[in-house]
């Protein structure tokens, strides 16, 4: 990787991390920075973006950023959005092809991460498309994880989706 490529990747990642959609647009449209340019840590702007800024995610995705890029631990932007509870950003990612059944290095789906953090709106959004029978590295399905955590509200959401015939 050339130093010049890293510099533009750092600039795009920095703007995305700050949630600066105007600078992201400028870099993508005027300077023609590739939306998947890597920063000095080998991450793309979508991986380091401010997840509370769905406009940044939308701009990167509209310009061709990969919604399923994973870091060394197998974490993708959809995992991060689910874990942090940013539903609007998660919706943008999914609308642009993010895989809600992607596994991270612990075998967790994004819905597992949302359950661990207690994000009921994220669980409600992910449940219809998630593999609710998938077991993470601890051997737990999403429902079993919710039960283990004593999260009755999440259990109710999951059970409602498991009763719907496919």
UniProtKB/Swiss-Prot annotation:
Keywords: Acetylation, ANK repeat, Cell cycle, Cytoplasm, Nucleus, Repeat, Tumor suppressor. Its main location: nucleus. It is found in: Nucleus; Cytoplasm. It comes from the Eukaryota. One of its GO terms (molecular function) is cyclin-dependent protein serine/threonine kinase inhibitor activity. ANK repeats lie at residues 41-69, 73-102, 106-135, 138-165. Signal peptide: none annotated. InterPro entries: Ank_Repeat/CDKN_Inhibitor, Ankyrin_rpt, Ankyrin_rpt-contain_sf. The modification N-acetylmethionine is found at residue 1. GO terms for biological process: autophagic cell death; DNA synthesis involved in DNA repair; negative regulation of cell cycle G1/S phase transition; negative regulation of cell growth; negative regulation of cell population proliferation; negative regulation of intrinsic apoptotic signaling pathway in response to DNA damage; regulation of G1/S transition of mitotic cell cycle; response to retinoic acid. GO terms for cellular component: cyclin D2-CDK4 complex; cytosol; nucleoplasm. Pfam families: Ank, Ank_2. Belongs to the CDKN2 cyclin-dependent kinase inhibitor family. Interacts with CDK6. Interacts strongly with CDK4 and CDK6 and inhibits them. This is Cyclin-dependent kinase 4 inhibitor D. It comes from Mus musculus (Mouse). The lineage of its organism: Eukaryota, Metazoa, Chordata, Craniata, Vertebrata.
